[in-house]
Amino acid sequence: MKLQKLYSKVRQALDDYNMITENDKIAIGVSGGKDSLTLLYALSGIRSFYPVPFELVAIAVDLGYEDFDLSPVKALCDELSVEFYVVKTDIGRISLEKSKNQASPCSWCAKLRKGALNDFALSFGCNKIAYAHHMDDIIETMFLSLLYEGQFYSFAPVTQLDGSGLTIIRPLMYVGESDVKGFKNKYNLPVCKNPCPYDGHTRREYVKQLVRQLNMENPGVKKRLFSAIQNGNIDDWVKCTKPSDTS
């Protein structure tokens, strides 16, 4: 995917759901993966021509695993003129301890990681956090909710975090994972290998393969599934209805 196409899709999401307002200070949660680096690239570029000014900082939560080198990410942030910070934690070890009787520590890890990111973002005066969830993530979350919770749900474009004053935005919501992979390859993004021993062995990975198979057998099914989520009256989505749709 070319840079201008990425800008176009991200700009559409920002505008459709009023994700950015004047003088926002936005923290990008950077994991070193292709998704967060693509989001970093997109928002840092859009910042130069967006109609309202906003600030960016990039924050990586180090889970405490060995051999996790974020220096290439630091170099990219320097190139893009984005401040970069690393939060050192023992979340990897803590998650394993707390989940001894569970299939995997992923839910604990996600909860603790988000908490660390939120706290650090607040300490730097940020009022918003940009997550790098793309269209496929939104669809996969819907399937996870259906299969394992019996509910039709997926996370929304904009989410207000009660009590913290933080707002979560998802600017990659119109970008498919295949486009993210294409952008990563075209621009040689410095992806860091995920050191987590559970990487690729989760329910989400199972659902990812399921959606991929469905789309192979029924071309275009992902776009139809995404449309169903947009139009499905999910509570969190109704709360952030596009401004153009309000009366």
Regions found by a protein language model. Give the residues of each.
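Solvent-exposed amphipathic alpha-helical surface segments
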Residues: Y17, I46, Y50, L214-E217, ...
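A short, charged, Gly/Pro-tolerant segment at domain boundaries
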Residues: G220-S247
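Residue-level detector of flexible, active-site-proximal loop/helix-junction positions
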Residues: L63-Y65, I91-R93, T159-D162, V175, ...
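Catalytic subdomain that performs nucleotidyl-dependent activation
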Residues: L56, D137-M216
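ATP-dependent adenylation/nucleotidyltransferase module used to activate substrates
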Residues: M1-M142, Y148-Q151, S178-K186
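Short, solvent-exposed polar/charged micro-motifs at secondary-structure junctions
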Residues: S95-K98, R203-R204, I234-D235
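Generic structural signal for well-ordered, non-membrane alpha-helical segments
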Residues: L3, A110, G200-R203, V207, ...
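Short, basic, helix/turn surface patches
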Residues: C109-A121, V158-S164, V211, N215-Q230
